Amino acid sequence: IFDSCGYLLEKGHGESLFGRVFEQTEFRREDIILQSKCGIVPGVMYDFSKEHILQSVEESLRRLRTDYLDILLLHRPDALMEPEEVAEAFDLLEGSGKVRHFGVSNHTPMQIQLLKKCVRQDLLVNQLQFSIPFSNMVASGLEANMLTDGAVNRDNSVLDFCRLHDMTIQAWSPFQYGFFEGGICLTVRNIRN
């Protein structure tokens, strides 16, 4: 899976680079899975409007130099989204062949349920921050019925929910850039001193 994350690297520059490299190599499009995201708008926060979703996909396709995405994720929850608008956008994208599968990123079980109320496509993925320092979704299940801090369920049982609903959990930042290189440890040590 190549997750281009659309707009985060200098307004799509990463997708443009990938598109150029893809065009200059012997990759066959059907041999790779291309995934992108939409929803985060710098300066505005989030936008899951039909118009924004459709525009984001068009821009990603243009930059990636392809005619379809295998997976489109709604990036971070838009607490004020209209699930009906998301459903309309997904129907148009699927119907036109521009997106084959859909998912979410960083959504809670209730946010997913709200989407499922209107969206008829399966949401196949929930991309979550998951790594050694961010493993609470597993730890809280291991410490059930205990008084430890790890027993506090801060994610609304998202791991169990995804497993019950056959949603793949994709880990984002699994190596937690900077954490294991010492940068964060040095910062913490400097704060303590």
Map each language-model feature to its residues:
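Beta/alpha (TIM)-barrel catalytic core signal, keyed to glycine-rich beta->alpha loops juxtaposed to Asp/Glu
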Residues: 77, 81-193
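Short, acidic/polar
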Residues: 46-65, 85-88, 109-114, 154
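A short, structured active-site edge motif that brings together acidic residues
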Residues: 30-42, 127-132
